[in-house]
Amino acid sequence: MVVSLDHLGAWLLKANGDRSDIAERAARRDGITHWCVYRSYRTALMDSRQPFVLWVSGTRHVTPGIWAVGTLAGEAVADSGATGRRQRVPVMLRWLDERIRLSRAAVLADPRLRDLEVLRQPQAANPSFLTPGHVRALRDHLAPAW
């Protein structure tokens, strides 16, 4: 789907729980100030104060799902020293307590969320997106944390 600001509810940023230390970073509540994205027309739409959720994928070591929420703190910019399409977007990330995280199973159980792009195209590059309807459904699950 072509994303436009007219039907963007929030961004969905992804981390691979099997190939990264994201579980350890979440356990320590590490402050994360930037996230890697791949330059596209979508990154050109990214701007400060837009909401996002962090989706952690994985099968072996982590429970996949939404682990954090936050807002973008600026536009996506070229990652210094990187070549190609790699960019970084500044973020203000807030880790969710483990009991509040929304697992992939819980997302699939909610008919309002079953069509998330991250479920339909799990290998797609960062960023993914949520519609306003998806955001309303997620807020039902994550309130008052988000």
What residue ranges belong to the model's regions?
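Compositionally biased, charged N-terminal/linker segments
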Residues: 1-48, 60, 117, 130-146
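Short basic/aromatic-enriched segments
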Residues: 58-64
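A generic structural signal for residues embedded in beta-strands
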Residues: 54-55
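Aromatic- and Lys/Arg-enriched surface recognition patch
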Residues: 64-132
